[in-house]
């Protein structure tokens, strides 16, 4: 998972995509005329103000029920009736908070991806300076979140699964921007003393490799109950490490004898 993304194969690590990450959700400012909000400078539709006025416990309970439903059934197969029942709220109240199921889905997905983003940002501070080790450790860091949060992990994976659906197209559009910032942060403070040639071109080669590597890896997995994220981590890191060794040593064995 270290550098590219599962969100509609947008590019870089396995599931979440640090090369194409979400464009924010930090500050929420309500408009007085409707319930539109500004998120990091962009207009997004968020839940009605009444939802934010609920107790934190109730909001968490509703979100948890929605995560469970979306992760198990996906967007298309999910039932708002089951969400309402599992959240313990009155029928119809859910749509006092959200205009429709799609708005609810993206709000929940935003929350989950924001949680992953903050986890990666915090963990990235302790990554090694050596470039190739840093990429591998970042992969392990991201997988560790999925292992701890399998339900949320399935939700993120499922968001990218239906590549031809209108919702997945919106997922890709929503989360593909501003990824370069995350990629740049991954390369901050690295030890470049051992790199040869143009450093920017080296970074570009790594980015292209990670995008292709992750897209290929992602085609071989699918969201399902009881996903073995530990096994996926082992396979991913082992394969990534093998390719990192090839990149470090080069693909030529030496000059041919004449």
Predicted regions and their residues:
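C-terminal peripheral helix-coil segments that are non-catalytic and often amphipathic
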Residues: 6-45, 184-188, 212-258
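Helix-turn-helix
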Residues: 61, 69-103, 107
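Short amphipathic alpha-helical elements of helix-turn-helix/winged-helix folds
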Residues: 65-69, 145
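Short coil/turn segments at alpha/beta junctions that flank glycine-rich nucleotide-binding fingerprints
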Residues: 72-76, 127, 149
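Amphipathic alpha-helical packing segments from all-alpha helical-bundle domains
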Residues: 114-117, 121, 125, 129, ...
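Amphipathic alpha-helical segments used for helix-helix packing
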Residues: 146-167, 215-226
